[in-house]
From Swiss-Prot:
Family in the record: Belongs to the LeuD family. LeuD type 1 subfamily.
Any Pfam family the entry gives: Aconitase_C
GO cellular component, one term: 3-isopropylmalate dehydratase complex
Protein name: 3-isopropylmalate dehydratase small subunit
Residues in the signal sequence: none
GO biological process: L-leucine biosynthetic process
Reaction(s) catalysed (UniProt annotation): (2R,3S)-3-isopropylmalate = (2S)-2-isopropylmalate
Length: 193
């Protein structure tokens, strides 16, 4: 996993509450186990009409929001069924930071396990951040736990364990590999039946 220290990018705004994993990535696209290729289906039923034409009224389709890598959204983001495909779709689309009023627990952990930073922020701060010009680069500094625009600084907090994992680009496998020698020693000591 790539370390996450400072991210600079533009933001897309989708301030709906209770966006569930079915809305993030519909079930019909979950037939693969690769982590890539899901971005084109992100928010599929909102982004496209029945003929697969872009919905011009959907915020991510606005010309000045394309290429955004920060998503500012509502409360309880990622609720519903637990599917890791939802963070995969967000990451494959290009999002590195999701800022919401709150997250479903499993979705929150899956974001971090996939190198994305989910930030919990109150509504007033999100609304101020959402007013940032669509072309402005927003800086998210994980080490200092601060988001900076040309006019505001917003502080956020993150659990120390998750912060260290993201800063160092560590996932479960890379953490396990740090103990490879200890694992081998243990396996030598354990009787084989």
């Amino acid at each position: 996993m790539e370390p996450f220290r400072i991210h600079k990018g533009t933001a897309a705004v989708l301030m709906n509450d209770n966006i569930d994993t079915d809305q993030i990535i519909p079930k019909q696209y979950l037939k693969r186990i690769e982590r890539t290729g899901f971005g084109k289906y992100l928010f599929d039923e909102w982004r496209y009409d029945n003929e697969r034409h872009e919905n011009p009224n959907f915020p991510l389709n606005a010309p000045d929001r394309k290429g955004a890598s920060i998503l500012i959204t509502g409360d309880n983001f990622g609720c519903g069924s637990s599917r890791e495909h939802a963070p995969w779709a967000l990451a494959d689309y290009g999002f590195r930071v999701i800022i919401a009023g709150g997250f479903a627990d499993i979705f929150y952990m899956n974001c971090m396990k996939n190198g994305m930073l989910p930030i919990v922020m109150d509504k007033e701060m999100r609304e101020k951040l959402a007013k940032t010009d669509a072309r402005e680069q927003i800086e998210v500094n994980l080490e200092n736990e601060v988001i900076t625009t040309s006019t505001h600084r917003f502080h956020f907090t993150i659990e120390k364990m998750w912060k260290e994992k993201l800063l160092n680009g560590l996932d479960e496998i890379s953490i396990t590999m740090q103990y490879e020698q200890e694992i081998k020693e243990y396996e030598r000591m354990v009787a084989v039946y």
